[in-house]
Every structure is written in structure tokens, then in C-alpha cells.
């Protein structure tokens, strides 16, 4: 009988939400109404209206009594789940839309390469509780790594390419080598990679004056080219600005992967692609959208723009990938060796490949932000 603060006693259905909630559940056959924790205080009114309906509608065919059950809302670190805040991100142009791979939306996660199985696996692991908490984003990333490790095709991609010349390898010669699509799947096929005199390696895999515990390519040191030969670095070439533009090495013909001599102890292994038949691709490296672990709480004192991670997207425009990736399709998943898990973006075209990083191979965020 308490009057509504605006309409007074004109309508006898106040509070409207509580009246409608239980009534619609009763008549529509809803047995369990699952709500988040803020609705717990509404449950007495929900029960009151349902019990009242059972009395005033004794002939109703329902042989059940709807129940309201509350559980915690899903909150992730470095993420905002509020639709109002997500809308603000879209409207202010901080993201490319609701399906931006940094958004915690279903379409955003799909575009980034998250599988339905990985999301369900994550939900199964965290369960639900009766108190509000915040789940570490690393758990979601672990779930997708675990799933993609089983299903992703392995391939090589060099994001920051530098030319490697094998000086004692015959010019014009090419070798075909077999590469397993997925070592985790005994039934998976293999694909061919071509080895030649000139390759591309990651620029960070070469250092001219390397520290003692640097096991990748440096003058005088041996390194294994994955699935190929052991090579010894002999030097490099620089441009007028002092930047390394070519690296030189000599290979040992007896160390082809699978031969007895290939078991020689070499501490460093790096990936590569052929300079002649690799294809160019754009690679989008996504990371956490916010720098604060709990942006919803931090947002009470800071503006949304102050909380954004300026490095949440880095675009690599001239990466080189294996030629079979030119036939990549949406809905397929790939592991770029030593780099991370990737999928083809809808922006991709036959003449301009675009790959999105789903997640890195390891959780580097905590290591960097310690």
C-alpha cells in the first residue's frame, strides 16, 4: 500500500519489477530464475508474489513453484564487463566495434580466435559462488592455450624478418622437408617446408655482441634451424645507419634433422621461413585492454581513457609466413612456432593476409609487469 514516489496509488503493481518477475515466471513455465547477487534482496518479494499466484490461481495447470537463485557475476582482471562501459568504448572510438578482439563479447572473443570449447572449459573450472570476486584473466588464457594446443596447426611466421644467407649452401638448390601439423595429434598430417640458401629469421634471434647466456645466433656460435640443419654464424652486414640487414652462416650438411649427427648438443633452436616462397602478412598482436587489474574499481577515480593500455594492439605490417598459410580459412586455428596462437581475421583478403594473435605461448604479462 506504499505509494509510488512518482505515480502515487494510480497503479497497484508497485514495485513493477518484482511484480512482473515472479508473475511472468509463473505463467510462462519458468522453474528456475537465475540472477546475479544484487537481486538477492528482491527474492522475498519474488516468493511473495509467486505464493500469492498459487493461491489466486488454484486451477492453473502449473504443478511447480518457480524459484529464484542468485550467483556471482563474472568479473575478469584487466577487463570491464559493464555493457554501459563497453558501449562507451565503442562510441568514443577506443575499439573498432563490438567485435573488436579486445572486447569481452562473444563476437570479440570469436574474432580473436577463442573456441567455444575453451570458453566452456574456463567456465567449468571457475564454477560459481555466492560472493562477488574477480577472476584472473590468466585462467581464461590458460583455457584457450590448452584447447588450441590440441587442435592448432603448426606453422612458422617471422614477425620482424631479417635475411639469413647460408654462404656454403649451393645457390639455386632447394630441399623439401616434412613438418608435422600437430605433434599433439598422432593422426595429424604433415606439410612441406622448403629450405634454401636464403631464409628469414627473427631480428631478435641475432645479436652481434651477445652476453654469455645468449643461445641464439651470434658470430662463432652454433644454432639449430628448426627441422633443418645446425648452422654456425659467421658475421653480418649493416646499412649506412649501422642496422643489421643480413646475417651470414655456414651449415653442416650432416646435421639435417633426423640424421645421427643432428643429435649434436646445441643449446639454441630458432624458427625460419624461406626467403623465396614465404608470403607477406599483417599480424595484429592483441593484449589486455586495460593497464589496471580492476578497471571498474579504478574507474571511480580515473577516466576511462586513463585506464586504457596503449599497447593493447600492435600491428606488424611486413611479417613473413609459410606459403600454406595463404590458404588459411576463418574458423581454423594456428600456432606460429615460438610466437603464439593465431587465427585469420575477417579483414583478410587473398592479396593481403591478416592474422590475429589469440594468445601468446606463455603468460608474458605477469613477467613484464612484476
Model region roles, listed by residue range:
Residues 94-196:
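Extended, domain-scale alpha-helical bundle/helix-rich regions
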Residues 62-110, 132-134, 149, 261-263:
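Flexible, glycine-rich loop/tail regions that form catalytic "lids" or insertion modules at the edges
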Residues 286-287, 301-304, 324, 333-339, ...:
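Auxiliary tRNA-acceptor-end handling modules of aminoacyl-tRNA synthetases
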Residues 1-86, 144, 153, 160-161, ...:
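Active-site cores that bind ATP or allylic diphosphates and position pyrophosphate for catalysis
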Residues 80, 84-87, 95, 129-135, ...:
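Zn2+-dependent metallopeptidase catalytic domains
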Residues 310-334, 338:
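A conserved acidic, glycine/proline-rich C-terminal tail/linker
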Residues 224, 229-308:
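C-terminal, non-catalytic macromolecule-binding modules
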Residues 21-31, 64-67, 85-89, 96-103, ...:
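Short acidic (Asp/Glu) and glycine-rich catalytic loops that position anionic groups and cofactors
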Amino acid at each position: 500500500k506504499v505509494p509510488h514516489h512518482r505515480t502515487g496509488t494510480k497503479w497497484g503493481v508497485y514495485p513493477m519489477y518484482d511484480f512482473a518477475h515472479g508473475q511472468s515466471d509463473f505463467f510462462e513455465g519458468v522453474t528456475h530464475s537465475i540472477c546475479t547477487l544484487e537481486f538477492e534482496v528482491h527474492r522475498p518479494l519474488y516468493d511473495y508474489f509467486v505464493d500469492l499466484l498459487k493461491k489466486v490461481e488454484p486451477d492453473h495447470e502449473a504443478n511447480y513453484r518457480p524459484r529464484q537463485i542468485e550467483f556471482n557475476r563474472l568479473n575478469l582482471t584487466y577487463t570491464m564487463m559493464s555493457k554501459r562501459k563497453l558501449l562507451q568504448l565503442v562510441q568514443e572510438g577506443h575499439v573498432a566495434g563490438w567485435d573488436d578482439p579486445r572486447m569481452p563479447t562473444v563476437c570479440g572473443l570469436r574474432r580473436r580466435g577463442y573456441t567455444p570449447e575453451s570458453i566452456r572449459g574456463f567456465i567449468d573450472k571457475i564454477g560459481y559462488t555466492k560472493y562477488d570476486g574477480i577472476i584472473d584473466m590468466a585462467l581464461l588464457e590458460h583455457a584457450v592455450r590448452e584447447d588450441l594446443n590440441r587442435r592448432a596447426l603448426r606453422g612458422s611466421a617471422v614477425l620482424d624478418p631479417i635475411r639469413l644467407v647460408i654462404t656454403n649452401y649451393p645457390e639455386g638448390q632447394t630441399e623439401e622437408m616434412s613438418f608435422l601439423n600437430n605433434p599433439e595429434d598422432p593422426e595429424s598430417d604433415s606439410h612441406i617446408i622448403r629450405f634454401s640458401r636464403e631464409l628469414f629469421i627473427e631480428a631478435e634471434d641475432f645479436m652481434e655482441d651477445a652476453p654469455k647466456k645468449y643461445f641464439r645466433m651470434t658470430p662463432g656460435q652454433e644454432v639449430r634451424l628448426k627441422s633443418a640443419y645446425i648452422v654456425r654464424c659467421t658475421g653480418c652486414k649493416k646499412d649506412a645507419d649501422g642496422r643489421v640487414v643480413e646475417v651470414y652462416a655456414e651449415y653442416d650438411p650432416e646435421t639435417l634433422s633426423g640424421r645421427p649427427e643432428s643429435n649434436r648438443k646445441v643449446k639454441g633452436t630458432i624458427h625460419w621461413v624461406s626467403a623465396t616462397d614465404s608470403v607477406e602478412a599483417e599480424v595484429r598482436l592483441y593484449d589486455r585492454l586495460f593497464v589496471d587489474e580492476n578497471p571498474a574499481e579504478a574507474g571511480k577515480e580515473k577516466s576511462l581513457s586513463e585506464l586504457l593500455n596503449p599497447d593493447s594492439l600492435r600491428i606488424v605490417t611486413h611479417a613473413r609466413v609459410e606459403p600454406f598459410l595463404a590458404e588459411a580459412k576463418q574458423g581454423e586455428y594456428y600456432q606460429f612456432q615460438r610466437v603464439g596462437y593465431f587465427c585469420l581475421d575477417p579483414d583478410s583478403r587473398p592479396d593481403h593476409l591478416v592474422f590475429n594473435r589469440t594468445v601468446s605461448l606463455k603468460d608474458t604479462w605477469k613477467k613484464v609487469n612484476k
